[in-house]
A protein has these predicted regions:
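Long, charged, low-complexity intrinsically disordered regions
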Residues: 1-108, 112-164
Length: 164
């Protein structure tokens, strides 16, 4: 039998906890500086323009070729990951914004967007939106399609600016 003091201690501890989203992203956003604010000024892309099998790469000028090579080979070590399968475009952008904000202290992240093989046009809606979104995000220095083991053309590695 559990005594009342143990029940009380357990209840007081559990009551202070908040549930975690399925994608592991905090729902609350608090920021002390403008540099670390949640990015919400993105635009949506409603017409897909990238096929599921197409490799993608984008980087800002001045990025080290060593970093790009490391990304292409998947040699970044463990990276936080988000899977956007099953999300609607708007939900995916919101989740992605929260995910990047939450992991702003990381240098690399992994985004699984899928290849969109079930789309009518043969073009990937989610992949096109993720690429469009990442090009707009101020914290993103580079991204490229993953190695086969990490999702191939259905996922991207993203290099984020160092958190200042």
């Amino acid at each position: 039998m559990i005594d009342e003091s143990d029940k009380s201690l357990f209840r007081s501890t559990v009551d202070q906890q908040k549930p975690i989203d399925k994608d592991g992203v905090k729902n609350t956003v608090t920021s002390k500086s403008g540099a670390n604010q949640l990015f919400q000024k993105y635009s949506f892309l409603y017409e897909p323009n990238i096929s599921g099998s197409e490799a993608v790469i984008h980087y800002k000028s001045g990025l080290s070729s060593k970093v790009l090579k490391k990304m292409k080979q998947g040699n970044m070590g463990p990276t936080p990951s988000i899977d956007l399968h099953g999300h609607k475009v708007e939900e995916a952008c919101q989740s992605l914004s929260k995910f990047i904000h939450f992991h702003s202290n990381e240098r690399f992240i992994h985004i699984i967007h899928g290849k969109g093989y079930h789309s009518d046009s043969g073009l990937s809606i989610m992949k096109s939106q993720v690429v469009h979104y990442l090009k707009q995000h101020p914290a993103v220095l580079a991204f490229c399609s993953c190695t086969q083991e990490m999702g191939g053309t259905g996922a991207v590695f993203v290099h984020l600016k160092a958190h200042v």
